[in-house]
Regions:
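Conserved HGGG/HGGXW glycine-rich cap/lid loop of the alpha/beta-hydrolase fold
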Residues: 9-83
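Conserved acidic catalytic loop of the alpha/beta-hydrolase fold
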Residues: 82, 87-90, 94-112
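Short glycine-enriched nucleophile-adjacent loop
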Residues: 121-132, 138
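Flexible "cap/lid" loop of the alpha/beta hydrolase fold
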Residues: 129, 138-167
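Alpha/beta-hydrolase
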Residues: 153-227, 254
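Short beta-strand/loop motif that positions the catalytic acidic residue
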Residues: 232, 238-240
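Acidic catalytic loop of the alpha/beta-hydrolase fold
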Residues: 243-247
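Catalytic active-site module of serine/aspartate enzymes centered on a nucleophile-bearing elbow/loop
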Residues: 262-295
Length: 295
């Protein structure tokens, strides 16, 4: 897969479909490599007429790592933030939004439909108000607004963020299978074998938990985005699982309520995951939202 110079770093990316089609930039979440946007799902977007771009965020996968920044003590920083103290992550979620726009620059793409999941939802929200001329439509999936007064993650889901990943391959795979199960939601059968295969591929491609810690530090440093979300003017779709234990559905509801004209799609039984049974509905909904640009 190719690399691009973007925002003074190197971004690993991948594309699907016809470059002359309307671009759709897919942005993944915390500690997640771009291959979590699996090829089958990317090709479903291609079949809807999109030119699909997926990429590794900074500090994950095969993009630039920020090793010189060290590994933060997340619990200490979390407690400091809870006490109202200012924290200073080595980079911000705004920097990550600028990375994504820098990738569009490198690919000579003036405007794109943007879709992000979880932390990726935060990133695309920021792109939409920070770089409004670059956005055709916005989809925010299983994300939130940064409002500290919203319901927080369930304790068992929050623990997943704070518990270190095992360094040994087989232990990592088994732990990942357990973690995915907790996040998956109760409404769909859990495909354990698929997630075991995915965990192995992710480990072999890039095992780098230090980057996830720094990304989480960046998330801890975010502010309430509601005052800026109200300025977004592009067609917006917010998708959320009704059974999300990590980012409760109230985060999706407030995102949709904050962006003028936004449509909200709540998928009952879906957790903090994208079960393959939901893909047709999700792809159709994103394509319909994108169609609003031309209508």
């Amino acid at each position: 897969m190719p690399k691009a110079k973007a925002n003074n770093i190197e971004i690993e990316y991948d594309t699907f479909g016809d470059p002359s089609s309307e671009p759709l930039l897919l942005v993944m979440g915390l500690g997640s490599q771009m291959i979590r946007w699996v090829e089958e799902l990317c090709m479903m977007f291609v079949d809807k007429g999109f030119y699909v771009i997926r990429f590794d965020n900074r500090d994950v996968g095969l993009s630039t790592k920020f090793e010189e920044a060290g590994v933060p003590d997340i619990m200490k920083e979390f407690m400091a933030r809870q006490r109202g103290k200012t924290i200073s992550p080595p980079y911000t979620v705004e920097d990550m939004a600028d990375d994504a726009v820098g990738l569009l620059d490198a690919l000579n793409i003036e405007k794109a439909h943007i879709c992000g999941a979880s932390m990726g939802g935060m990133i695309v929200q920021i792109i939409a108000f920070r770089h409004p001329t670059r956005v055709l439509s916005l989809t925010s999936i299983m994300s939130t607004t940064g409002n500290p007064n919203l319901p927080q993650a369930k304790p068992e889901a929050m623990q997943l963020l704070l518990k270190p990943a095992p360094a040994e391959r087989e232990a990592y795979i088994e732990e990942s299978v357990k973690r995915y199960r907790i996040l998956y939601g109760s409404g769909f059968p859990y495909p354990e074998d698929k997630f075991r295969e995915l965990a192995a591929v992710l480990y072999d491609r890039s095992f780098y938990p230090q980057g996830m810690a720094r990304q989480l530090f960046a998330i801890l440093g975010t502010e309430n985005r509601v005052p800026k979300l109200v300025t977004i003017k592009v067609p917006t779709l917010v998708i959320h699982g009704g059974d999300d234990p990590l980012v409760p559905v109230e985060g999706g509801k407030e995102t949709a309520a904050s962006i003028p004209g936004a449509e909200l799609l709540i998928i009952e039984g879906m957790g903090h995951s994208l079960p393959f049974e939901t893909w047709p509905q999700i792809v159709d909904s994103i394509a319909k939202n994108a169609d609003k640009v031309n209508n």
